[in-house]
């Protein structure tokens, strides 16, 4: 039984909403509540690991647990990205390069172990563990890359959002799931 949702249009809508919640949630805890990035990372890493433990224990896809794990990942990923840039002072460029390296390493180990990187067929504990590690790094990279594009490249948030939306929409237009039975 697949342990993650099939990627359909509704998935992308929920993903965007959850990622937006992650971005604003991380900023709310780190800046508005003045907890700082370290405390926010600590709190939400524990929450992420708790939901992930439940998710892995279930051995099946459960929408509530999946999206709670996803959202906690988005919050901790955003806080990590901001920590790398602002607290460590590495900036968006170096932070993005580090995260790309980490993501490529995780994907390489995942492929070596599972002989596949398909998210359409996550059926084992090991595959799902790699999925969530890659997912957390990708969330962190997404925040860093978005900030890099908007700030470091100087194109601004509106153009960056339009560019990324266009790329996503062109991908969705050409996407054909392996299994037509879809759920989120």
Give, region by region, the residue ranges found by the protein language model:
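Polytopic alpha-helical membrane proteins, predominantly small-molecule transporters/carriers
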Residues: 1-184
């Amino acid at each position: 039984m697949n342990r993650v949702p099939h990627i359909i249009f509704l998935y992308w809508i929920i993903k965007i909403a959850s990622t937006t919640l992650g971005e604003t949630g991380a900023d709310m805890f780190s800046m508005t509540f003045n907890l700082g990035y370290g405390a926010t990372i600590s709190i939400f890493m524990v929450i992420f690991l708790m939901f992930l433990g439940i998710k892995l224990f279930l051995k099946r896809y459960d929408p509530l647990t999946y999206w709670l794990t996803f959202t906690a990942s988005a919050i901790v990923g955003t806080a990590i990205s901001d920590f790398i840039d602002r607290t460590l002072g590495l900036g968006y460029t170096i932070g993005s390069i580090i995260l790309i390296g980490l993501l490529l390493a995780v994907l390489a180990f995942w492929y070596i172990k599972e002989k596949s990187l398909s998210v359409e067929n996550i059926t084992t504990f090991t595959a799902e563990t790699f999925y969530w590690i890659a997912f957390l790094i990708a969330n962190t990279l997404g925040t860093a890359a978005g900030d890099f594009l908007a700030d470091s490249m100087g194109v601004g948030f509106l153009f960056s959002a339009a560019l990324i939306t266009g790329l996503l929409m062109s991908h969705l237009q050409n996407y054909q799931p392996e299994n037509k039975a879809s759920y989120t």
